[in-house]
């Protein structure tokens, strides 16, 4: 099975800033700390340390806004929305995505030297506000190295 992904601009800067502001203003109790990766996502005993806020933890106005701006893909239905928050030093080790989602779109909400490393292609995708990596299926092995400043990413999962 071919592992494919597309790097493209998915949100304009103003919209991405609005999403980042929503994320930055979420109360601490809405965030879930993730400290482990487990098979089948985990690759080579990798670990993680970052905060996750799924749509079930978000206020309704945030979910409605994020659904409204979600990119549309023919033959794919939006199934889940999440925001990942990385504080300085946080990371997401080598992993593949779950196989029950057909597309996994991760959009950067800031410009920075941080980003996503795609191991299979030895490619680093630097954070560019509004730019995303859209992975088909489980996709290639990828990770986020320890970040040097606060980082937010918007995640859309499609069935």
Where are the regions that the model predicts?
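Non-heme Fe(II)/2-oxoglutarate
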Residues: 1-74
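Short, conserved, surface-exposed binding loops centered on an aromatic residue
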Residues: 71-75, 95-98
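A short coil-to-beta-strand element that immediately follows conserved catalytic motifs
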Residues: 74-82
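Short glycine-rich loop/turn motifs
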Residues: 80, 102-105
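Catalytic core of Fe(II)/2-oxoglutarate
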Residues: 100, 107, 111-159
């Amino acid at each position: 099975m071919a592992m494919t992904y597309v790097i493209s601009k998915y949100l304009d800067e103003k919209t991405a800033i609005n999403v980042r502001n929503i994320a930055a203003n979420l109360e601490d109790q809405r965030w879930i700390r993730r400290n482990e990766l487990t098979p089948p996502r985990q690759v080579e005993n990798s670990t993680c340390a970052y905060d996750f806020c799924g749509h079930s933890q978000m206020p309704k106005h945030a979910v409605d806004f994020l659904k409204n701006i979600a990119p549309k893909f023919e033959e794919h239905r939006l199934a889940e929305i999440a925001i990942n928050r990385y504080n300085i030093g946080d990371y997401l080790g080598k992993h593949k995505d779950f196989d029950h989602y057909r597309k996994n779109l991760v959009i950067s909400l800031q410009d920075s030297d941080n980003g996503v490393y795609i191991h299979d292609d030895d490619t680093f995708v630097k954070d560019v506000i509004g730019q995303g990596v859209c992975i088909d299926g489980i996709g290639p092995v990828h990770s986020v190295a320890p970040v040097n400043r606060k980082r937010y990413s918007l995640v859309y999962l499609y069935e």
